[in-house]
A protein has these predicted regions:
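Conserved beta-strand-loop-beta-strand hairpin that lines the nucleotide-binding pocket
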Residues: 1-17, 61-142
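Solvent-exposed, flexible loop/coil residues
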Residues: 20, 55
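Primarily the active-site beta-strand->alpha-helix module of PP2C/PPM metal-dependent phosphatases
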Residues: 23
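Conserved short strand/loop->alpha-helix "switch" segment adjacent to the catalytic nucleotide/phosphoryl-transfer site
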Residues: 32-54
């Protein structure tokens, strides 16, 4: 189930150039933002969430930089859930199902899906009809 971002009391948006430093900045911003929201970094979902975020931003840099000069990271949280999204303007929407794991392609996405499903979360790829591209939305229980 996809949580509408507007229903979450905590939200933050970060737009970065699609370059390698974006991974570190997105992760550090997540740590600072979560801490500011009172979500301790020792929570069992946070380390996997940070790895998921790093993988998604890395994928945007590696596969979308030619089409997408920027990557946007969306952070959201409520009492019982954490939402992360990564948006780029590359038109390709990768599958987030068993084919990611079974074909061996998309190793980063296979890791993402293993972590998301292991935590009881959800992952959805949504097309962006306004500016093109897609967003990958991750929802994890807290």
């Amino acid at each position: 189930m996809l949580t509408p971002l507007a229903t979450l009391p905590y939200r933050h948006v970060l737009t970065l150039p699609t370059e390698p430093s974006a991974v570190r900045i997105a992760r550090e911003t997540a740590e600072l933002t979560l801490n500011g929201w009172g979500i301790g970094l020792q929570h069992p979902s946070i380390d996997p969430a940070l790895l998921i975020l790093s993988e998604l931003v890395t994928n945007s840099i590696r596969h979308a930089a030619a089409h997408s000069p920027q990557v946007t990271v969306i952070y959201g949280a409520g009492r019982d859930r954490l939402v992360l999204a990564v948006h780029d303007t590359h038109p390709y929407r990768p599958p987030l199902d068993g084919t990611v794991v079974s074909t061996g392609a998309g190793g980063g996405l296979a890791t993402v899906m293993e972590l998301v499903l292991g935590l009881g979360g959800t992952a959805v790829v949504r097309a962006d009809v306004m500016v093109g591209g897609k967003s990958i939305w991750i929802t994890l229980p807290l």
